[in-house]
């Protein structure tokens, strides 16, 4: 990215931090044209399906989804059921589903940050840590946490599911927001493959099945 684009994104992320987290940061002066560009990026980010706490989100990969269902069922019947931990898992799955089908959801990442700031202290991270291992999603949770650290001013200590920071997480988000790829393709996010191999396999399995189902005999 050139310096102009970097300034636009710096101010975009600063304005989002102020709006959603109350973090005031000094923004660089920008021309009206640059602010229009920032507004266009913001509008694109807001076009995604928003996270809803009333919805249940699912994995693209069937194996991961079966494991998620088992985890949720076992937790709901546990003596020490942690609703906050289940809710965190739901937000994480929403973000993973969106990343695997379309691309990074900035509103989804913001929702994750808001949840951690408001209810993170009530989450049982011993349980959550075991779930991330069972579901093979630690690279994905690290990507989400890295975006929060690099764009929203979070400290790594606020995000226990950050197992290894992704150095170029901010750049990946910026590239996605600037891309023009179409919904439902992995063309704009092939670099995400290393974060979710199971998800990519599940995505293409579903796409092939849909194509076969649509073939007229």
Describe the residue ranges of each PLM region.
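Conserved NTP-donor binding/palm subdomain of two-metal-ion nucleotidyltransferases/polymerases, i.e.
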Residues: 1-217
């Amino acid at each position: 990215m050139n310096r102009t684009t970097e300034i636009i994104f710096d101010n975009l992320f600063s304005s989002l931090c102020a709006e959603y987290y109350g973090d005031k940061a000094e923004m660089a002066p920008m021309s009206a044209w640059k602010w229009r560009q920032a507004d266009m990026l913001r509008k694109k980010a807001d076009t995604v399906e928003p996270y809803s706490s009333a919805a249940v989100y699912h994995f693209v990969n069937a194996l991961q989804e079966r494991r998620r269902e088992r985890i949720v069922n076992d937790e709901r019947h546990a003596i020490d059921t942690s609703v906050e931990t289940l809710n965190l898992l739901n937000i994480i799955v929403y973000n993973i589903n969106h990343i695997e089908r379309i691309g990074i959801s900035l509103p989804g990442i913001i929702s994750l940050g808001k949840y951690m700031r408001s209810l993170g202290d009530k989450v049982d991270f011993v349980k959550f840590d075991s779930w991330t291992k069972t579901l093979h999603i630690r690279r994905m949770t690290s990507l989400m946490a890295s975006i929060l650290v690099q764009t929203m001013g979070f400290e790594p200590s606020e995000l226990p599911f950050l197992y290894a920071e992704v150095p170029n997480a901010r750049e990946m988000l910026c590239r996605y927001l600037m891309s023009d790829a179409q919904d439902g393709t992995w063309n704009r996010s092939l670099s995400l493959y290393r974060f979710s191999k199971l998800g990519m396999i599940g995505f293409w399995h579903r796409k092939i099945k849909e194509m076969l189902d649509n073939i007229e005999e």
